[in-house]
Amino acid sequence: MLFSPPLQRATLIQRYKRFLADVITPDGTTLTLHCPNTGAMTGCATPGDTVWYSTSENTKRKYPHTWELTETQFGAFICVNTLRANQLTKEAIQENRLPALAGYNILKSEVKYGAERSRIDFMLQADFRPDCYIEVKSVTLAEKENGYFPDAITERGQKHLRELMGVAAAGHRAVVVFAVLHSAITRFSPARHIDIKYAQLLSEAQNKGVEVLAYKAELSAQKMELNEPVPITL
């Protein structure tokens, strides 16, 4: 995924009201950015960090600038735009960069499924193969080189795991992909210290046939690409 037009650089003043952030540009202008992340963003929004933002061509938007990346004062890149996790995963599947998800010729997005009336991020289909249901989660919480999900209690995430267990029980492939969007992370675990229920459900889901995968994105202010498998400890 190439950023076109190129991202612009600023320095973070503060994030507030969950969806907004104030930054100061190199010429001293203060801007308010849209923050497309509802999570805690722990370690991703420290005042003084470098922010890379995109600008929409839609002149009717109240906040035309969107916070895409954080470049921390320690040199790590973090993609804070949670929408990018799905885009990067879709791109990687279509370009056959994820061997575990190769061999399908049809990819559908936002398909309704499950007893709790959810929408799956992606469904893959091919002749003579079971349908493959994929739920994608964005991983940005880091402690040293360890990556964790979630960064706050997520009842929605718990629901998705229950739905995936139902998919597996029905004879389909069920997959959860953790898209690691933090350059300092080298391994992944569920955040038991934050959401013990989610961690327990993830282990249960794996035991019941749900595949658990984690891939790391190569991040820069110019492009992003999801391709590197990350070790998982449940």
UniProtKB/Swiss-Prot annotation:
GO terms for molecular function: DNA binding. The keyword Nuclease does not apply. Keywords: DNA-binding. Residues 201-220 bind DNA. PANTHER family: SUGAR FERMENTATION STIMULATION PROTEIN A. Signal peptide: none annotated. Binds to DNA non-specifically. Could be a regulatory factor involved in maltose metabolism. The gene is sfsA. Belongs to the SfsA family. The keyword DNA-binding applies. InterPro entries: SfsA, SfsA_C, SfsA_N. This is Sugar fermentation stimulation protein A.
